[in-house]
Design a protein with these regions (language model features):
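Interdomain hinge/lid region at the active-site interface
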Residues: 171, 175, 219-286, 303
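Rossmann-like NAD(P)(H) cofactor-binding subdomain of soluble oxidoreductases
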Residues: 58-63, 67, 75-140
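Small-residue-rich helix-loop
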Residues: 204-216
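Hydrophobic beta-strand scaffold residues
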Residues: 33, 54, 122-124, 165, ...
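Hydrophobic residues within alpha-helices
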Residues: 22-26, 112, 157, 198
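Rossmann-fold dinucleotide-binding core
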Residues: 10, 104-182, 186
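NAD(P)+-binding Rossmann beta1-loop-alpha1 motif at the extreme N-terminus of oxidoreductases
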Residues: 1-70, 96, 101, 132
Length: 303
């Protein structure tokens, strides 16, 4: 249970594929919720039915809450829901903490943190990894940037949504770490797609190949979680291609800022471009293999 009445009330902004299950995990942990989403999705009503209070705006969602969590799509969205005319900054009380769990620009994160600090409001950037399954099960990895004391105070909130929770450094460090994560994730996805496509093109039993290689040194989260979905033709999104592309764009921008070449991430970015061009932007990132299937004229599926 939360230690104080102040921290027991949480404003949650953004109830999409990730945000809704994350919010739902806070309720059984003893927190009360005020929730807001920019569109009236069915998931909003699901959270309200579970005990959340519907807010009329980000400002309203933040009002009276000791913690405000944002989980939206992109950098401009975070700027709008926190700093916009009806943003959370206009409703949140001094001494409260805003936790942005979106994946956005580290530069904008630092700007938002500075604006909130002027109002006496703390900020943590706490992007996540683990996909929709991790969000549903409360097992997300959470990469945090901010002050140690603020992190310690908010740790019980984060523990209701995740398991592997690390404070990396000051504001922006969480976002930079998430970009490092997205490099590793996207390149692992690319490697898995190439391996499965070679097996299919060579007329192998792709299921047997996946079973064989995922149990050894080639094993990865992608092999375990996305490989079986590919073989069953399941491309429903846990994390959409278009969102992976948004993150890879941030990776490329960050690399450019420090004059660093990232050929693996760049190649993954280009192959996801092919997937998007074929009309699969709203599918899960396992749809990366469709770029290879188009090239080979053959699908990688279980027989």
């Amino acid at each position: 249970m939360p230690a104080t009445p102040d921290s027991a009330k949480i404003g949650f902004i953004g109830l999409g594929i990730m945000g809704a299950p994350m919010a739902l995990n806070l309720l059984p942990a003893g927190y009360s919720l005020k929730v807001y989403n920019r569109t009236d999705r069915p998931r909003v009503q699901e959270v309200v039915d579970a005990g959340g209070e519907r807010a009329a705006s980000p400002r309203d969602a933040a009002s009276g809450c000791g913690v405000v969590i944002t989980m939206v799509t992109d950098t401009p969205d975070v700027e709008a829901v926190i700093l916009g005319d009806d943003g959370a900054i206009h409703g949140v009380d001094a001494g409260s903490t805003v936790i942005d769990m979106s994946t956005i620009s580290p530069k904008l994160t630092r700007e938002v943190a500075a604006a909130l600090k002027e109002k006496g409001v703390n900020m943590l950037d706490a992007p996540v990894s683990g996909g929709d399954v991790g969000a549903q099960q409360g097992t997300l990895s959470i990469m945090v940037g901010g002050d140690q004391a603020v992190f310690d105070e908010c740790l019980p909130v984060l523990e209701a949504m995740g398991k592997n929770i690390n404070l990396i450094g000051g504001n922006g460090a969480g976002q930079t770490t998430k970009l490092c994560n997205q490099i590793a994730v996207s390149v692992a996805n690319l490697a898995m797609a190439e391996a499965l496509m070679l097996a299919a093109a060579a007329d192998m039993d792709v299921q047997k190949v996946l079973d064989a290689i995922s149990g050894g040194a080639a094993g990865s989260w992608q092999m375990t979680n996305l490989g079986p979905r590919i073989l069953q033709g399941d491309f429903a999104p846990g994390f959409m291609v278009k969102l992976q592309q948004k993150d890879l764009k941030l990776v490329m921008e960050a690399a450019n800022d420090v004059k660093l070449a990232l050929p693996g991430a760049s190649l993954a970015h280009q192959y996801f471009n092919i997937v998007e061009r074929h009309g699969f932007a709203d599918e899960g990132t396992q749809a990366l293999i469709k770029a290879y299937e188009a090239q080979a004229g053959k699908e990688a599926r279980a027989s």
